[in-house]
């Protein structure tokens, strides 16, 4: 198909991610490639972006067949990239090996649950992608926290001022 990350809304979203990382003083830039879905392989400092986001016709087809497109608009695309940048940042700096990271987020070696029961009233985790996803696993907790922290014009200091999750944002 000749698709690359230089097509669709992807280049603008990646440029924005670069700007957000630079504004926070982070020199790391995740490697990005097209794949069948969003993911950041464990131990790899990069982000897989769904191929259907590289062309508007494929995006429309995905919406028609699946009834949704994760990252299908620029706002959602940026939010998901921030989240996956957190996943990529972790292995780039070997964060999960640090004792203080484990004390704040938990052990990354804990197996992912087959399913999880979210606690909507919990204030121990940030809210970013929805469905209280940060509660599902320590690495998701970090990725969601990183995304909230990275978002430009975020009011997280006020939003989470009285929450135990603030400790994670200050990490």
Where do the PLM segments sit?
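Auxiliary, metal-adjacent structural segments of Zn-dependent hydrolase domains
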Residues: 2-61, 70-71, 98
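Pan-zinc metallopeptidase signature
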Residues: 4-5, 134, 139-171
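Hydrophobic (often cysteine-bearing) scaffold residues that line and stabilize catalytic clefts
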Residues: 9, 13, 74-78, 82, ...
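Active-site-adjacent bridging/hinge elements
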Residues: 54-63, 112-124, 147
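Short pre-active-site segment immediately N-terminal to the catalytic Zn-binding motif
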Residues: 60-82, 131-134
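Post-HEXXH active-site segment of zinc metalloproteases
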Residues: 71-79, 91-125
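Active-site-flanking alpha-helical
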Residues: 86-94, 147
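Flexible glycine/proline-enriched surface loops and loop-helix/loop-strand junctions
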Residues: 124-132, 154
């Amino acid at each position: 198909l000749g698709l690359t990350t230089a097509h669709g809304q992807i280049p603008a979203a990646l440029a924005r991610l670069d700007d957000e990382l630079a504004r926070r003083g982070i020199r790391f830039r995740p490697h990005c490639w097209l794949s069948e879905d969003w993911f950041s392989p464990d131990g790899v400092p990069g982000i897989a972006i769904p191929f259907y986001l590289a062309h508007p016709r494929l995006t429309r087809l995905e919406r028609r067949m699946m009834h949704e497109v994760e990252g299908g608009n620029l706002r959602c695309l940026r939010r998901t990239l921030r989240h996956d940048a957190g996943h990529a940042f972790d292995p780039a700096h070997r964060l999960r090996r640090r004792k203080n990271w484990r004390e704040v987020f938990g052990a990354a070696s804990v197996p992912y649950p087959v399913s999880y029961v979210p606690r909507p009233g919990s204030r121990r985790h940030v809210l970013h992608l929805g469905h209280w996803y940060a509660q599902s696993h320590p690495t998701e907790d970090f990725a969601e926290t990183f995304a909230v922290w990275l978002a430009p014009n975020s009011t997280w200091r006020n939003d989470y001022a009285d929450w135990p999750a603030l400790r994670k944002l200050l990490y």
